[in-house]
Amino acid sequence: MWAPGVAATLTYDIATPAVIALQIAAARRPDDEALTTTVDGAPVAITEVAGSGGPLGGRTHLVTCGRGQLVVTYAGNGPSPAARAIAPTAFDRIVALRPSRYCPSDRLVGYAARYRRGDDLATVRAIVADVHDSLVYDATATGPTTDAIDTLLAGRGVCRDYAHLTVALCRAVDVPARVAAVYAPGLDPMDFHLVAETALADGWLVWDATRLAPRQSLVRVATGRDAADVAFGTVLSGTAQLVGMAITAVADGDLPTDDHDGLVRLP
């Protein structure tokens, strides 16, 4: 188990008093972490939403602030070596089979049939390999409304598009799948990252069709049906514009080697 150190700094210009929901803290509360918020250099309160943590979510924090420049800073270590992955429940599997906003799997059933193999693991591996081989990583080819079908037709996208297409195709062949927002040591350029997870046997297996970072050192931030559930920042009221973001994720020692075909579980 690699225990990376992670950090994020988000800068918002607040034009009118705003309430912002943030999901940037590690889902498994680290032994050592700090989360601070300031507006024009003066501290403002940030609170963790009660009940927001859990196997299917991440820890959500709320900040209420007036006009000015809001700076949110988070730093923490990764999960402890003793942290264990959480097995899917029956309800988890049901939720992870349903179509969702960015993963309209019900519209891909006929197309996805080509990936069926002798068992679910072989089917998932075929899907992940084909998503990797058929898409071009292109940050200019995607937007906030792009869903898995848009990505399939365009043949290009970013990490969230790779994850959405992987998840949608898995659900279309009756394999429960979800997304996980993560810190990703080794990612270049550094950013928040989105990967897919499938419920196979007694655990959630993580897949990254971009192959841009080793899965063994990923640090879970939030988990959900698709990107709508795991957004790092959501303006709930007021007027706020994200004007800056800096992400850091560092492994403890050398990065692990990942062939992106083996079985990896995230705590």
What annotation goes with each model-predicted range?
Residues A129, D161-T239:
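Hydrophobic/aromatic-rich core segments of domains that either
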Residues M1-P81:
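Intrinsically disordered, low-complexity N-terminal segments that are enriched in acidic
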Residues I14, A82, R93-G157, L165, ...:
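Secondary-structure boundary elements
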Residues A21-Q23, T198-A213, G238-D259:
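Short flexible/disordered coil segments
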Residues Y74, G78-A90, V95:
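Ordered, amphipathic secondary-structure segments that act as subunit-interaction surfaces
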Residues P17-I20, D31, P81-A85, L205-W207, ...:
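Intrinsically disordered, low-complexity acidic/polar segments
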